[in-house]
Structures are given as C-alpha cells and as structure tokens.
C-alpha cells in the first residue's frame, strides 16, 4: 500500500495533457522517480513510418555525448590480429568458430549487450540471425558493427555509441542516462538521439514524422515531450527561444 501511494503521488505531479519542454521534463522525471537505486532515464518515440516497408525502416547508431551510465559488454567475432586488437580495446568476449557454435546453441546470451564481427566471419555469423536478430544484436555494416576496425567499434560502443531500430509498432526506445546525471547531460543526450532520428527520416515517410515522444524513469510516470521542439533544448519555458 505504501508503495502504491508513492507511485500515485508521483503520477499526480504529471499533467497528462501537457507537452513538456525537454529540460522541464527531465527535472520532473527526477522529481517523480520513486526508486531507491539510481534509476535509468528512457525516451520513447512513436514514428509516422510503416516498418513493414523497407523504404521506411529507421535504423542507425548515435553517440551519446555523456553515455548511458552503463558500460556495454561487447562480444567480438574475429581471429588473429583482429581478435587481439579487440581484446586490447576492452572487448568482453572474443572468439571465432567455437564461440559462434556456443551462441548458436543459445549459450552466454546474457553476457553481452552488443556484437561486432569482421567481414570474413559474417558467412558463419550469419547463421546466428535466429538467435541474435530478435535481440537486436545481429552485426550490420550500416551500424558499423561489421568492420575490420574492431578496436574502434569496441571503443565507440563502450564510449556511449548505441544502436537503434524501429520496432514493428513504429516505436524507438533510447536509454539516455541515469537520474544521477545532471539535467544538462540528460538533455544533451536526448538532443543527440533526436537529431539522429530527424536526420534519418525516410523520404517515403508521409505526414507527421515524430508523432509522439515521452520520457520516463524506471517505474516512474511517463512525461509527454514536445517533439516539435528540436532546438534550444536547454531553455525551459521561453517560447521565443524555440
């Protein structure tokens, strides 16, 4: 009952009819965070695209300037010097045929958050699509995860580079940090994600592109964002600055 009252009190602070400026939303999200741990801050977008059509797929990567607050665990499929370079760059798991077989059997799937592969191994890694695909972990040249420069890929991912892909319901989800981040850090991470989504707008997409955006913390209420606001995001309420 006590927990329920806490959640209801947090929910009551959010105006469901209002579209909040990003800075105001971040401050409200922190105020309404109810967890005792350092909660994750997430943004969800609803896009005006049909992901069933190849020319309306939205997929890419973005380097969050302040990271997500969590260091990603990276698995790399590589051999020889490339494998050594991946290990030196901080890859958590490195291997080739034996590792591919392990993953194919569904083993170790909870030990990594991102996957990188060299092009020469993609013929073998390709058969992992059934296992990695549904988890959004399949290496892809378009996102820089199929590359000979595995060291750079590992460094980028651990430095805050995240991969995203619109789901079948036309939604995109981003973790933009932790409640412990400063307001400015969270807004700047949000801005980086928003800029990349706007940049990747498919030419085939008609009508309003970003239909809805909402920010929330772990177990916190959803806060509707003014998705038309794409500039001067660190200004809270000055309409002239929008």
Swiss-Prot record:
Report the function annotation for this chain: Binds directly to 23S rRNA. The L1 stalk is quite mobile in the ribosome, and is involved in E site tRNA release. Protein L1 is also a translational repressor protein, it controls the translation of the L11 operon by binding to its mRNA.
Gene3D superfamilies the record matches: 3.30.190.20, 3.40.50.790
Q: Do you know which Pfam families this protein is assigned to? A: Ribosomal_L1 (PF00687)
List the NCBIfam families: rplA_bact
Gene Ontology cellular component list: large ribosomal subunit
Which GO biological process annotations does it have? regulation of translation; translation
Recall the GO molecular function terms of this protein's record.
rRNA binding; structural constituent of ribosome; tRNA binding
Per UniProt, subunit arrangement is: Part of the 50S ribosomal subunit.
**Which SUPFAM superfamilies does the entry link to?**
Ribosomal protein L1
Q: What organism does the record attribute this protein to?
A: Streptomyces sp. (strain FRI-5)
The name this protein goes by in its record:
Large ribosomal subunit protein uL1
